[in-house]
Amino acid sequence: MNHKKLILSLSLLLPTAVFILYIIPKFNMETVDFLPFLNAIINGTVFFILIFAFMAIKKGKRELHKKLIYAALSLSILFLLSYVFHHATHDSVAFAGAGLVKYLYYFVLITHIILAAIIVPMVLITFSRASKEEFKTHKSIARLTLPLWLYVSLTGVIVYLMISPYYPY
């Protein structure tokens, strides 16, 4: 399968799988109640790894940049697996805040969700360009991918911090 077909397939499959998780019945597994916290840790770690990867490439340290991006991708895959497993085993938690904080929460959540769906193909395309040593186009799309990936990673942590007081566990 070529890169374009794989990127398109994953870009359609992942958001569809996440959507399905919200409509299927859940099975209870209290032993994985720690997953939202773990997901926030993973998101925060990805955020900092991406910053270090950016700093590395700016200093001309291509190998370090490559290793850091592989780490960010690996952690993002781990996050996705953990996220899917958590939402397959737990119902969504309603935000119970009021006033301005409620609007802020939903703004952050909605932008996070939309950009999380958008960032998947962008990350895959950016990675694909680098793996094929098409560094000019890689750099061009990375200028858009990096800030969006940073935003999604950071807002993942913020969403967790805002919703965590309402978890029943």
Predicted regions and their residues:
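Alpha-helical membrane insertion/targeting regions
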Residues: 1-169
